[in-house]
């Protein structure tokens, strides 16, 4: 699969450092190999130059003319329904979960740990009942040790 996230006009990027950290911006123009002109009309980012080292390119791209004014970028952003697409993307969901997790207090962490313990207890009980049922049915359970012994027996038969 070839590389598809190019630095180009209309490419949506996520700012990774500085005061804009976490915000989405659209690349309007490439200034040089290290800097681009970005604009984020719906994310509260004014048009400014930004270092490429501080941007993470996304798979999203909106169509607008080269060096378009902010109003045209805003219109293209709204027309592409980018906010809804970004909200359901795995990248956004993971970032939201990290943010939620970092805001847990001590009691919330305790409740989370207790809930995980309860879930694991239920899973263990269900697994053990299934294991007992397969054992009582007489269905063969193939373990690595059994498999090794069966292979040795087959080799011994083949030699005779």
Swiss-Prot record:
Composition bias, Basic and acidic residues: 146-160
Gene: RpL14
Protein name, as recorded: Large ribosomal subunit protein eL14
UniProt key word Ribonucleoprotein: yes
Region (Disordered): 136-160
UniProt family annotation: Belongs to the eukaryotic ribosomal protein eL14 family.
Gene3D superfamilies: 2.30.30.30, 6.10.250.2270
Short name of one Pfam family: Ribosomal_L14e
InterPro entries hit by this protein: Rib_uL2_dom2, Ribosomal_eL14, Ribosomal_eL14_dom, Translation_prot_SH3-like_sf
GO cellular component labels: cytosolic large ribosomal subunit
Organism: Drosophila virilis (Fruit fly)
GO molecular function, a single term: RNA binding
Keywords for this protein: Ribonucleoprotein, Ribosomal protein
Annotated GO biological process: negative regulation of neuron apoptotic process; ribosomal large subunit biogenesis; translation
Keyword Transit peptide part of the UniProt annotation: no
